[in-house]
């Protein structure tokens, strides 16, 4: 780290490096609305704590967020802010509602087929005009289902070829349905996909090689494309209805990147009613929903009177050094306390958790994840056994091998249950499940909880020591050498990074850049790696 640095970080990364930073001159937070508890973002605690801790260093502050009408006044006063709201837009937007043939009849299950037909006709019309279009849908399964039906409805199907096809064949499966969609000029924007797959599709779309992208809520996570049209097929985000805030955020994806001066929004269902959006700030408001991990990380002077009794309940009977461990874990204090008391009262369980290998056996990992599942999370299921199996599989095998194992497992499971699925359905379901597991469980949730468990085990243990860090690194970095794992954040496939062998301990990235031709990379991998370097 040099004297002057520019960091672009997630809230989790901020918390990792902040202890090494003495001063912060300028602090900019994009998509600041995610600090609100109303947004139900699973990482809201990290963002609140990171914001609070950075602000203790008194930096200049700039907060950026769309579609907010007002902000908590107490927050404004505490940090001496000025709230500036603008409705200015570089793009003129036109909206059009698509009605059913029975004009007064809302879209529902009874006329769902007509709704789909109307969508496909609209997409054909927009494609004929060479207008790039994004279709917002409520879930990944719905995106896949509509893409599949849309291809069937086409009279002429294009046969496009993309560099990513070679990578898909080598690392996923030549039967993956995404390949079929891309060949027909259709993309899927799914938050479960590896970053490079998402980035590649956006590149093809922006270059005019994809006509349509079916997208889920991942669309509103700061994605910029050349889309002239946004079609809002469903006013839901999963099962819940989208809010007026979400609706505006989705609409805002039309006509960006200065290619078009008009963006068109088409929608089928009645949009949410307009409401003034006031941004709540948990670290300041401190209502009854305030997460315990946020509360204990506030300085005593910043804890409101009505929360002080809650704070005392959380910390009573906790030694000061244990409280510091709990605070640094950024995880529910109640759950950590429950885990601590359980291990304290069960020395046999504690001793079984004192492992430090890079590659734990299935039995060791299953036992460890069982403690997390049953005690930390309070579940009575045996779900941890399946998690342990998948973790072992992911840490020992290539992505393609993991998928093959999952396909075999699913076939066996479905045969036992007497359920009928085609080979294609099983393959694609297996791929979706594995990609989702890697993104949500292996790279984030399991490492986080293993770290919490390790810290409490080592606090209680008087003899041996637990060290899960090597195994955690394998999961988080997809088995990539830690010296170059930063390239994962730039969207380089882990398959490419695993091919970079015998790297020097110092200046590894520079070494890779200057010796790129010696590594056995596919053209697709090489192109992405060159861009990242």
Regions found by a protein language model. Give the residues of each.
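Structural recognition of the conserved hydrophobic beta-strand(s) that form the central parallel beta-sheet
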Residues: 7-10, 28, 59-66, 212-215
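Long, hydrophobic alpha-helical segments
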Residues: 274-323
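A short beta-strand element within the Helicase C-terminal
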Residues: 23-28, 211-236, 248, 263-268
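Conserved segment of the helicase C-terminal RecA-like domain
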Residues: 55-60, 229, 236-284
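Conserved interdomain linker/interface between the two RecA-like ATPase lobes of SF2 helicase motors
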Residues: 52, 58-150, 182, 187
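C-terminal accessory/interaction regions of large nucleic acid-associated machines
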Residues: 306-533
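SF2 helicase catalytic motif II
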Residues: 11-60
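Conserved C-terminal RecA-like helicase domain
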Residues: 1-6, 17-18, 120-212, 227, ...
């Amino acid at each position: 780290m040099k004297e002057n640095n520019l960091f672009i970080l997630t809230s989790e990364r901020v918390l990792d490096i902040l202890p090494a930073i003495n001063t912060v001159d300028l602090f900019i937070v994009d998509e600041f609305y995610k600090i609100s508890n109303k947004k139900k973002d699973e990482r809201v605690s990290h963002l609140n704590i990171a914001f609070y801790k950075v602000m203790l260093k008194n930096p200049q502050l700039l907060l950026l967020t769309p579609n907010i009408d007002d902000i908590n006044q107490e927050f404004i006063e505490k940090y001496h802010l000025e709230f500036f709201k603008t409705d200015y837009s570089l793009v003129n937007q036109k909206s059009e509602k698509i009605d059913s043939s029975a004009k007064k009849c809302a879209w529902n299950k009874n006329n769902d087929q007509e709704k789909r037909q109307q969508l496909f006709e609209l997409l054909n019309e927009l494609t004929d005009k060479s207008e790039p279009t994004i279709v917002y849908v409520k879930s990944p399964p719905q995106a896949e289902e509509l893409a599949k039906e849309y291809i069937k409805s086409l009279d002429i199907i294009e046969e496009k070829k993309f560099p990513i096809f070679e990578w898909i064949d080598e690392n996923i499966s030549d039967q993956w349905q995404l390949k079929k969609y891309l060949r027909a000029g259709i993309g899927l924007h799914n938050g479960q996909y590896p970053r490079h797959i998402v980035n590649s599709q956006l590149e093809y779309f922006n270059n005019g090689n994809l006509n349509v992208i079916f997208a889920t809520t991942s669309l509103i996570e700061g994605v910029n494309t050349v889309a002239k049209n946004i079609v809002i097929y469903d006013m839901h985000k999963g099962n819940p209805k989208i809010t007026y805030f979400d609706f505006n955020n989705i609409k805002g994806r039309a006509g960006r990147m200065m290619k078009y001066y008009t963006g068109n929004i088409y929608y089928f269902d009645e949009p949410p009613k307009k409401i003034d959006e006031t941004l709540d700030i948990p670290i300041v408001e401190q209502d009854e929903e305030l997460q315990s991990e946020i509360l204990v990380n506030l300085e005593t002077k910043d804890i409101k009177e009505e929360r002080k009794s809650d704070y005392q309940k959380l910390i009573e009977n906790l030694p000061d050094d244990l409280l510091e461990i709990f605070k640094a874990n950024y995880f529910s204090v109640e759950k950590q306390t429950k885990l601590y008391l359980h291990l304290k009262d069960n020395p046999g369980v504690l001793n079984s958790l004192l492992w430090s290998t890079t590659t734990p056996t299935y039995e060791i990992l299953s036992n460890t994840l069982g403690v997390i599942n049953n005690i930390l999370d309070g579940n009575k299921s045996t779900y941890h056994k399946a998690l342990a199996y998948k973790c072992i599989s992911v840490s020992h095998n290539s992505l393609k091998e993991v998928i093959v194992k999952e396909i075999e497992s699913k076939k066996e499971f479905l045969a036992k249950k007497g359920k009928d699925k085609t080979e294609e359905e099983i393959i694609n379901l297996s791929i979706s499940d594995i990609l989702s597991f890697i993104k949500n469980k292996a790279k984030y949730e399991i490492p986080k909880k293993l770290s919490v468990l390790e810290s409490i085990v080592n606090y209680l243990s008087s003899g041996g020591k637990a060290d899960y860090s090597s195994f955690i690194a394998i999961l988080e970095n997809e088995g990539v050498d830690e010296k170059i794992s930063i390239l994962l954040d730039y969207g380089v496939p882990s398959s490419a990074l695993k091919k970079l062998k015998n790297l020097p301990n110092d200046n590894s990235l520079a070494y890779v850049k200057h010796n790129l031709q010696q590594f056995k990379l596919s053209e697709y991998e090489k192109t992405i790696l060159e861009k990242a370097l």
